[in-house]
Amino acid sequence: MQTLLKFSQRIDDITEYFGKASAFCVLLTIAIGFYNVIARYLGRFLGIKFTSNMLIELQWYLFSLTFLLGLAYILKHGENVRVDFLYTNWSPKTKAWVDLIGHSLFLITFCVIGLYVTTHPVLQSWGRLPDGTFGTWELSPDPDGLPRAPIKSMILVGYGMLLMQTFSEIIKNIKVIQEN
């Protein structure tokens, strides 16, 4: 069990790093959004275009990263949605059993299906052709837009981190069940 707990701790450490990156993305999203708003209105007033599609797309890329990088962090800290009016009154062992069953049956299934469904579109976005070779990657349809492949790849990272954190939570729940 000690080896599994060390493995769980390593996953938790990585999750903390991704959680901090998610928080940083929030700050960048706000800063870029603020710039986009000011530049748009100032540009209208002066008759000069100060914004670009790149900055607008970067803003929604960062907004997406906030959630994709933060999913595992939310699970680790127990901020995920629950039926709290029941859950709060239960003993730690009962909570651990409910989480163990829920994570094992539903969250792992959700992550595996998510990884399976998104892998092919991500590879296509990187330019993978039907014959297995690679061509040009997917670009924004807007002029001066950003490539789509990097942000689509982060979907896989988000699901992967959520799956790894789920395993970590299962290990910790088993420990709670064994101790009580």
Region spans (language model):
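Alpha-helical transmembrane segments and membrane-interface helix-loop junctions
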Residues: M1-N180
